[in-house]
Regions:
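Long, hydrophobic N-terminal alpha-helical segment
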Residues: 1-33
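N-terminal glycine/threonine-rich, aromatic-flanked beta-hairpin/loop signature
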Residues: 23, 30-57
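Short beta-strand segments that buttress and anchor functional surface loops
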Residues: 25, 55-57, 93-97
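Glycine-centered tight beta-turn/hairpin loop motif at sheet-sheet or coil-to-beta transitions
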Residues: 29, 57-61, 98-102
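Structured surface patches comprising rigid loops and adjacent beta-strands/short helices at the edges
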Residues: 41-44, 60-80, 110
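Low-complexity, intrinsically disordered Gly/Pro/Thr-rich segments
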Residues: 80-96
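Edge beta-strand at a domain terminus
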Residues: 95-111
């Protein structure tokens, strides 16, 4: 795991292969695993109401909605793939803090 500053320009996770993707969001208060249509993905900052994470359906990318935040990134690599039925999913984990809350976001993609 490495730590880096993520900007809007830097963080764009392609998801061309799946009409639905799973986003696993952890916070101290809750954890949720849901399947969203791409245009339904939207997590808001509790204090500002600014979207933290959204899906750009026109460009099929996921972007973190912050100009610059510190995030520890565990990229998708061979070995962190999950078989599910006939498909295999890879995932990338982004750990970051915003508004004093720690978040861990796992973005699953069909490979």
């Amino acid at each position: 795991m490495n730590t880096q500053t993520i900007t809007l320009a830097q963080l764009a996770t392609a998801c061309q292969n799946a009409a639905y993707i799973n986003v696993h969001l952890y916070t101290p208060a809750m954890s949720s695993l849901s399947t969203f249509k791409p245009d339904q993905i939207r997590f808001l900052s509790a204090s500002t109401g600014v979207p933290l994470l959204r899906f750009q359906s026109k460009t099929s990318t996921i972007v973190l909605q912050a100009l610059s935040i510190q995030a520890a990134v565990t990229p998708s690599t061979p070995g962190n793939e999950i078989p599910f039925g006939r498909c295999t999913y890879s995932y990338t984990t982004y750990d970051f803090a915003l508004d004093g809350v720690n978040y861990s976001v796992n973005i699953f993609q069909k490979t």
